[in-house]
Regions:
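Single-residue recognition of alpha-helix capping/boundary positions
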Residues: 5, 25-26, 49
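N-terminal signal peptide c-region/cleavage motif recognized by signal peptidases
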Residues: 14-16
């Protein structure tokens, strides 16, 4: 994802002042987990689209539960990061 794309995602997730305060690791997680949540919310009957959704889930969701726990621990004292991270479910895999 480009820097511009990442900033657009952050602006949708957090107010501009908050987005500017997020550590890069958290911003990357937000972008990935939002893609994961997008694919989790999709339903399809077309076999080709089902395969595409499954690929999207594997690519974007696998490992995010552990990553979220790790980031919450690492940034426990960082109010802006925790505010964003606390919005995500702890278990989606």
């Amino acid at each position: 994802m480009t820097t511009r794309g990442l900033m657009l995602v952050l602006l949708l997730v957090a107010p501009p002042a908050l987005a500017a305060e997020l550590p890069h690791e958290v911003a990357e997680f937000v972008a990935r987990r939002d893609r994961c949540d997008h694919f989790r919310g999709e339903d399809a009957e077309n076999p080709a689209r089902i395969r595409e959704i499954q690929r999207g889930l594997r690519a974007n969701c696998e490992g995010t539960d552990a990553a979220l726990a790790r980031l919450k621990q690492r940034f426990a004292g960082h109010a802006a990061a925790r505010a964003v991270l606390d919005r995500y479910d702890d278990a989606v895999e």
